[in-house]
């Protein structure tokens, strides 16, 4: 199983166990919508498409696990690090890239790395349509 599929399996498991059907549906649309946008923008900007796709899938995982928005970007980066480490499929620098992007995805007012900006831009873009 490739790495994106491993993450998709984890995300699907989280969403399938949500009791609120509307929130579950929104979760699928939002997480996978942002993920697809990340893949396209990363390709255009010559960033790592696979890691951007994964960052998009995991960027709001804390919210969908807890239904709590407080400090969700920071807390989500901690959970994402645990998930990625437990899969034993990612190098440390890849985990750092993904988790830093997740940590920064709600910080629209500051300049971040070009990789982080992919997730920030896609998340903003997705909120217009999803």
Label each region the model flagged.
Residues 1-130:
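Metal-dependent phosphohydrolase cores
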């Amino acid at each position: 199983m490739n790495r994106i599929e491993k993450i998709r399996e984890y995300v699907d498991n989280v969403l399938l166990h949500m009791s609120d059907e509307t929130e579950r549906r929104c979760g699928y649309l939002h997480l996978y919508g942002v993920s697809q946008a990340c893949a396209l923008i990363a390709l255009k900007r010559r960033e790592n498409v696979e890691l951007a796709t994964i960052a998009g899938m995991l960027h709001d995982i804390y919210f969908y696990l807890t239904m709590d928005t407080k400090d969700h970007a920071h807390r989500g980066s901690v959970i994402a690090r645990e998930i990625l480490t437990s899969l034993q499929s990612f190098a440390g620098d890849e985990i750092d890239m993904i988790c830093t992007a997740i940590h920064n995805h709600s910080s629209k007012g500051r300049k971040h790395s070009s990789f982080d900006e992919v997730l920030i831009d896609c998340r903003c873009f997705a909120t217009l349509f999803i």
